[in-house]
A protein has these predicted regions:
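Interfacial transmembrane-helix starts/ends
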Residues: 34, 68-84, 92, 210-217, ...
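Signature of the first transmembrane helix
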Residues: 1-56, 90, 94, 120-121, ...
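Transmembrane helical elements of multi-pass membrane transporters/channels
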Residues: 2-14, 180-188, 192, 196, ...
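Short runs within selected transmembrane alpha-helices of multi-pass transporters and secretion channels
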Residues: 10, 18, 49-56, 116-135, ...
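Interfacial segments at transmembrane-helix termini and the short loops linking adjacent helices
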Residues: 97-116, 315-347
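Helix-loop junctions and terminal segments of transmembrane helices
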Residues: 49-64, 265-289, 295-301
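Membrane-proximal transmembrane or re-entrant/amphipathic helices at the cytosolic face
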Residues: 440-481
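Interhelical loop/hinge segments that connect adjacent transmembrane helices in multipass membrane
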Residues: 170-178, 193-227, 289-292, 414-428, ...
Length: 481
């Protein structure tokens, strides 16, 4: 429950902060910030170079083999790898910042923001390394407390910079956000470094570690960088191709990525916490030959994520306009949220499917599916955006995410030898459509949303889709963790 609570708190804080930014710099400023952070995200993925996951696995492995004698050796080797990788990527970002700003983003005013990001990149990557190390030691409570402190401190510094220096200037706002994030990373690095120094682990310099680090980190680095590169290419391409169909492409991009998506995916933070619990549980069952337990978890998790996604999809569809008017004073964002709301069940179920796939040791297949659908998304956006504008963005988003979900679910069912009954999804969608239609006749959005939940779940109970044992299982599963 700790991970779920932390995810919920951090996602809520991030959403509130996003609303503050949207009111401060507008949708065009949000679009520019999203493009800048997309480039920064790619640099961070390349700079981390898979070392977070490698440090986590190698630390856990050493603790299981030799106790704490080999932990120092693991961390020192990972530290050298991280410094070399992050410094190289940071140097490249500094050198090519003018070309990236001019040719990719189309705004030379953010050269300073990109170079500021490059200066603090090693600190961010070292934070990822120490996070992986403490995760390998299973010190989740420590990481949760530090992460909350980092988020609060980062947002505080950013708000201070915006209020005292940046104002509503988009370029300065980008630098303020990057500086605030860097200060949060610096705080995390300091705290985790102090905690590590207090451990006083014995040193065993005879343990060979270099090749093990490369074997663990390099495949992850290549896969993550390819995926991140495609995602960045997609984000950078959207405003350029939208410019052929709309007069304000940057504002449209900021409206979708900075306003609609945070609200659409906010309820999923609870499922993300559940997915963190599923990965180790399924891994234990897989190693211990617990096929019946795997089948039970698969059906229960997919069913509850479907019901959860359909419920919030209906709420966002009914209350999307009122919610976006309240948060952003932007009716166009409300229309877009209603357009994307029916995709919530698929997106939420996909998150659980990915977690179960990883728990069964099939991470490489998830990476393959993601890279394939990202390539198709880039192709689809290139051709559809100039013709249909944001509707083309929606079509490409829907088709590629549906394909990714289909491939992931099919692979999960194949490796577990399970089948799904069509009765539950068909009746769930039927009940949802009927409930939305009925509650949509209520003129007040708040009342229609309030009526939707009991109407929807009553219809599920009457049709036999929802049973008391489903809720009892969820309560037992989360309380046991």
């Amino acid at each position: 429950m700790l991970l779920t609570g932390v995810n919920l708190l951090l996602r809520f804080a991030g959403t509130v902060f996003g609303v503050y930014l949207s009111r401060r710099i507008g949708e065009q400023g949000l679009g520019l910030l999203q493009l800048t952070m997309s480039v920064g995200s790619l640099a961070m993925i390349a700079g981390i170079g898979g070392i977070r996951t490698a440090a986590m696995y190698l630390t856990a492995e050493e603790l299981g083999r030799r106790g704490r004698r080999g932990v120092n050796r693991v961390l020192s080797g990972c530290l050298g790898y991280s410094l070399v990788c992050s410094a190289a990527v940071g140097g490249l970002l500094w050198v090519f910042a003018p070309a990236i700003a001019r040719n990719w983003i189309g705004n030379t005013g953010i050269i300073g923001a990109l170079r500021l990001f490059s200066c603090f990149l090693p600190i961010t990557c070292l934070c990822a390394l120490l996070t992986g190390y403490f995760t390998g030691e299973n010190r989740i409570g420590v990481l949760a407390a530090v992460e909350i402190g980092e988020q609060i401190f980062s947002m505080g510094v950013t708000v201070l910079c915006l209020a005292l220096w940046a104002g509503s200037d988009p370029e300065r706002a980008c630098r303020s956000v990057i500086f605030g994030s860097a200060m949060g990373s610096l705080l995390t690095l300091s705290l985790l470094g102090l905690l590590y120094r207090r451990e006083r682990n014995p040193v065993d310099a005879s343990i060979p570690i270099g090749r093990r680090i490369l074997r663990a980190a390099l495949p992850l680095a290549i896969a993550d960088t390819c995926k991140g590169g495609l995602s960045t290419l997609e984000n950078l391409m959207v405003p350029k191709r939208l410019a052929l169909a709309t007069a304000d492409p940057l504002g449209a991009f900021g409206r979708v990525t900075g306003m609609v998506f945070p609200v659409l995916m906010f309820p999923a933070c609870i499922l993300f916490g559940l997915s963190e619990l599923l990965i180790p549980e399924l891994a234990r069952c897989h190693c211990g030959g617990g096929e019946k337990r795997i089948a039970y978890l698969l059906h229960r998790s997919l069913k509850l994520s479907l019901l959860y996604g359909v419920c919030f999809g209906g709420l966002l569809f009914l209350g999307g306009n009122a919610l976006c008017l309240r948060l952003y004073s932007n009716p166009e964002a409300g229309n877009l949220l209603r357009l994307f709301a029916p995709l919530a069940p698929m997106l939420y179920c996909d998150a659980i499917t990915d977690a179960m796939t990883k728990g069964l040791g099939q991470q490489h297949m998830a990476v393959r599916f993601n890279i394939l659908t990202n390539i198709l998304d880039v192709i689809g956006l290139y051709f559809l955006l100039p013709v249909w504008g944001l509707k083309g963005y929606f079509v490409s988003f829907f088709l590629t995410h549906a394909l990714n979900f289909f491939l992931s679910l099919r692979h999960l069912l194949r490796i577990t030898g399970q089948d799904l009954c069509a009765y539950i999804p068909l009746w769930t969608l039927t009940c949802a459509i009927a409930s939305v239609w009925l509650c949509g006749k209520v003129p007040e959005p708040i009342l229609s949303c309030a009526a939707f939940v009991p109407v929807f779940f009553s219809s599920l109970y009457l049709t036999g889709v929802l049973k008391g044992e489903d809720l009892r299982w969820l309560r037992r599963f989360t309380q046991a963790k």
